[in-house]
Amino acid sequence: MANAMHLLHVMSYQSDTPQTIGRDTRRRVWGFARPYRSKVVGFLAVVTASSLLGVVPPLLFREIIDGAIMAGDRDRLTVLGLLVVAAALAQAALAFVERWASATVGEGLIFDLRVALFDHVQRLPISFFTRTQTGALVSRLNNDVIGAQRALTGTLGTVVSNAITAATTLLTLFLLEWRVSLLAMVLLPLFILPARRVGRTVAGITREGMNLNASMNTTMTERFNVSGAQLVKLFGRPSEETDGFARRAGRVRDIGIRNALFSRAFVIALTLLGATGTAIVYWVGGSLAISGSITIGTLASMGVLVAQLYGPLAQLTNARVDVMSAFVSFERVFEVLDAPNPVADSPDAQPMPAEATTGHLAFHNVSFRYPAADEASVASLETDATPDEPGRIVLDGIDLTVGPGQMLAIVGPSGSGKSTLASLVPRLYDVTDGSITLDGHDLRTLFQEELRARIGVVTQDPHLFHDTVGANLRYARPEATDADLDEACRAARILDVVRRLPDGYETVVGERGHRMSGGEKQRLAIARLLLKDPAVVILDEATSHLDTENEAIVQLALADALAGRTAIVIAHRLSTVVDADEIVVLDEGKIVERGRHGELRDAGGLYAELWEALVRGETGAESGAGIGPDGP
């Protein structure tokens, strides 16, 4: 009883999700299919030939009954029987070619869509990723694309072949007996009219199911990584997490049951309609045969043709529902493709000059605020899709110059804008006002890939892919030899550690490098930076999480890494920047002090307070979390 009530609840559940599919979505799908026009034409030719062949066997059946069996002609019966077999073999061969053609077009279109989606997403600004649920995004790139793929690959052939089959079958029926054919057509509106409404309903269910699946994927993505799993264990909440996941999975189950029951009820209704139509044809046609108006062979042929008519009509109606479900997938994919990218290459972007980059950096009256949600994200991929206003100004009137080979240190309290300032150099964000130049070139006029090739960054928590040590190092220079790796690791004071690993450079470091210590990860990141050989280096709290021993080793490695390069160093431990060519003190997004260590220490300002706190062994300024927002 409880199960029955549950099913009734599932059946009656109403989605509040919009259920219409826009013309723009359909137009864009056809746009992706445009490169395959020649293959589509060939596919249509094969489908047409196969559909025309489909009416041959019923006509042969008429001849077998009227011209062979009724006449007692065994030779004619044998020939006609062989022709039926030949027609079936030809149809089978054409069906194989038809399937190959539809799969080629469908899979090719999805390949193009998947690559375009991946390329677009990875070029989106960091602000997109800070707002987006990773699980929902992965679901969009994976599940939704697969949903579109299945529908297109299977439905493309179904729609075209069944449409042509229905048309040729109906024409043949009229040629055989127009009165019976008119009766067969009476039920056609009952196949066609409900399809639009049913399609909308199923599309709404499909869209809701995809959203629920994305929510479930987000939960798994956040919990099934080292940091998430560790947090759950340390707080002793596996039971609560399982309960929460069960609730999400239960909603996915309910929507799946609803979809299955609704779809099955529709198929049953179509089957009953087809059976009713076939019965009408046999009843009326049988009466005509009894009266001598048509032959028994014609009646048998029409019975087969009617079955061939209602079958494709039912499949076409179902295909319409499948197509609308597929367009839901496309709609969700296009939503990501339309995600705004405020940090794109300018249409008139120029390549970097051929001569070597000197590393002269200048900030000209730079101001910055973080973009609002509608400027840099997709609402349906956020946990809270409530629109917000543009962020407050976090950097205001910054004027700085860093000469080639010089070190600029940026210090200040947490939230003062240190990491934000550094993130503007590789254009993880663009300035709101003012400009930044590298060797006299406005960063916004340069191609991003060329700009970033000249900038190296080491953060307090460097990212390592779940891959080998060698693969992580070669991410900076894919063509690097083992000798190049040795040289970089030696300079980064990590070569001895690598050689002690079980498989050397082939040792897998684990997700985010969790199999390495913090100091080892930092030194691998420095080795990777040395392989990149940038003109400008940014160190964002690179030693803030290390103990004294590891910090000393990393500082030696950093000294080699910074030699001859322009450097911006964001420091929590002021002892690491006492030798900087210039120290800039930020507070609430503004430069409040600047100078060398001795000058600032003796000036009695904010820097002196931070230095005094360091001397006393107190915590002065909290460290940021890498390049990105500094917090409120």
Language model features with spans:
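Short intracellular "coupling" helices and adjacent cytoplasmic loop segments at the cytosolic face
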Residues: 9-19, 107, 115-139, 143-145, ...
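Transmembrane helix-loop-helix hairpins at lipid-water interfaces of multipass membrane proteins
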Residues: 12-15, 34, 40-94, 101, ...
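ABC-type nucleotide-binding domain
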Residues: 354-632
